[in-house]
Amino acid sequence: MIRELDLSAKQVKAFDPIYKAYREALDRAIRSVPDPVISGEAAQRAALKERLANIAAVAQVKRDYVDRFAEVLTAEQIRLLYNTEGQIGTNIKRAAGESSRQIPRVLSGSGRRVTQDWGEAGDYTAIETGAFFKVVISPSARTITVTADDNVIDFLRLERRGGCLAFSLSPRSSRTRRIENLSISVVVPVSASLREIHVGSYAGVESRMPLRGADFNISMSAYGEVKADLVDSGRTRLQVSSYGTYEGTIECAGAQLSVASYGVLKGALTCTGTADVSVGSYGSLNGDIRAAQVNLAVSSGGKYSGAVKADAASLGVSSYAQAAGAIEVADLKVSVYSSGSLRGAFAGRRCEATVGSYGKLALTGSAVVEDVTVQLSSQGEFSAPDLRVKRYDIRASSYSKAEVWCSELLKIEASSSARVLYDGPGRLETLSDNIRRR
């Protein structure tokens, strides 16, 4: 504790007797409570009353000792002391004298809902949720409140680890066989220091106000859900996997987003810097991306639906993945491979495209484009019949296809098995049987 508070030798000398008296007062305030699980209904009610009395007694001791600690500590050190120990009611099991409860053979929600106050949240920096917890970050909350079935709530835990609020179930015993029908709701106050959210199996976190911070690290998996808007943040790292879901808008300086294994991300992304986004393994992303630089990779059955707007962008679609949406990029590099497909209205100065292995790239719209370079192979297809391109440089081979419109100069190098259809007033440098005007 002394190390946590960073006390000087002089402070330690004055702090020790006060802290010793404080701990003794806590011990006197807490009364033992019988295990309500093995008792009848009346005994369970009595145990609940005793538990609440313990919480009130602990709160009173902490309140009484604020002024005593103030003789030695600053207000911030007192706050840190109570945070480090676990604030009033944070760990109900400790206040009740139940520190090592294990889940029984079968734990099934009774349907009888009860609510407990677990005390103040403090200046927490992270939230971590175990299975079945649904956490709401509320601007109107003042303390942590937990609502669950009356036969479940005594098996819930809150640990504080370096500023992290970690919600979980008590450890399973060797005889635990089934956990079912659990509904656990937690409401926590807002913390300006929040930087991380980690959501586990069938759990969720929802923020009822936009989250702000220098950097954010958010992850969810195994059907975990997060609903939150991020604004004015720095570097943001977001991972969605294993049927997890993230819903909300993101405004940040830079982003690293990953959606995989049937994960779902719904919401727009706006970056002042670089946005690195990957969607794979049948994951899906539905939302516009706006950034100075966009690096988007969609693969392995992944899906992206939304507009891309950037000064420069690199888009890659492969392995049966799909991408669709408007592309407003001054300098675009795009590759489509392995039966991937990309379709969208393009507006920009330059485009460099590579399409192969049954990939399909369709650039729609009638915007004026300065230069487009296309490399086609292995039955790849490129289609931009209405795009007003000034200069084209196309190389096509291995049964690939292209359909284009050109206004100035059209350079084509095509193998005998490739086919190119063109239109427009542009001058064609090469003419052969497989290069034809529409």
What do the predicted segments below correspond to?
Residues 62, 391-396, 410-414:
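Short leucine-rich amphipathic alpha-helical surface patches
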